[in-house]
């Protein structure tokens, strides 16, 4: 007999609350759950359930490379990465919850001992890095908060096909191959999250998405604003001196400070 996917409608506030609870329970039970984020629909599985992970790998035709972990709250990053790079902290503060996946160095072991003892490093990490995302959709985050173990969630489509923007798209590709689908309507952006890898003081965009590379650079930029209330001319003078000193410290021309992630402004004339 052909299996079918159970569909939960989640359009009203009460339906969304109930769907989040049922989704969390299904994940904890080892089921594959389709759900919306602000970008595209994803398929979630709990990482400490080998059977669920095997089904997800088969579904996505991805036998080895790990899937990104989806977080209920931005501060949950510290469950996985003990030493979050400053650049990543800046992106988290400005762009999470939101359409940004970060690939961060782990440092040899997961920060949360319970996860480490369960052997989840090998499940979640690749070349000592981990992919993390905090979606900007209340239903998704409420569901994730109801699960005690890491939830991974790749896009709800077959490998090589377009990401699903609606529950209808998910069913077209995955009906009968996932256990539960929470239908909360079309996604806000209809495109994938931007993937950025951060290591030390360097970063690079690994996959284009909602945020462009220019927007990521702007999010990372640090701004120095000089305001001299007694004499506005001094603001411009102070800004000029700061540009010169900063350029010397960074060993770059003052005209390249923006490219290095700095913006020096004056509130005076």
Annotate the PLM regions.
Residues 1-227:
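Active-site-adjacent structural elements in enzyme catalytic cores
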Residues 223-269:
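Conserved active-site segments centered on acidic
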